[in-house]
Amino acid sequence: MLLARDGAVAAFVRDRNAFLFGNVVPDVLVGYMVPDIADPIPYRITHFAESEPIPKPRAWEFWDGYVTPLLHRAGCGARVEALTIARERERINRVHYPHRYEGMPDLPPIPSAESSTRPDEVEQSLLDLTLGTWAHLLADNIWNTRVNEYLTARGGKPSEEFRIKKQGDFDWFGKTLHVESVVRATPRLKAAASAFAQYPISSDEVLKATGVIHEVVRENPGRADHPPYRLLTEAFFSETLAEVLDTTDRLVSEVLDKTNC
């Protein structure tokens, strides 16, 4: 959604494929997203958060420790666009059903930059991946802060019943969002993931995570309606989502003018 709104994040990111992968990085090695992680990394490490009922990731610490050292690459390099699920389907269909496309022009070739493993381009992708990870942590901080405030305002406190209702509401809200971009496990992305400074992510883990992303996007084209929320409200979701997007763009805009390329 940040890339689609043409704000500061969209202007800053060069490798959109890496940025989108970064958006899920905190949930990969903790074991939430990818099954059968041999040695899961504790949540307090992957999410920069204390072990509490409604944890609030310290996104600013992650920025200082991992994004700032890479900012010398900001704005450098050729753009790598994200792949939509529709384009992926068309590429696959052209392989399996070539007769359907007889007489039609070929799809544009994939730019060589998308699979490049040149050190400077991998470093650019690493910045975008790391920025995506920060965006995840910032979003979690804002969402959980607002959930905590919502609960406190109604005299409630965290409990197992609260957790179940909250998770159910978030699951349904997620299904209402129209998401069409998927991540490609390119050599460039794998190289950037293995160089992720907080903890390396192996090629196998990248492949597994991108597979999950593809399934999620395929199964959730964006629903027009949903069952009634059990804890939160439509207003809560719309207002907090807007805050997440606006805050992320605002913070990134503060470094846009300092790019070196």
What residue spans do the PLM features occupy?
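N-terminal leader/auxiliary helical segments
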Residues: 1-261
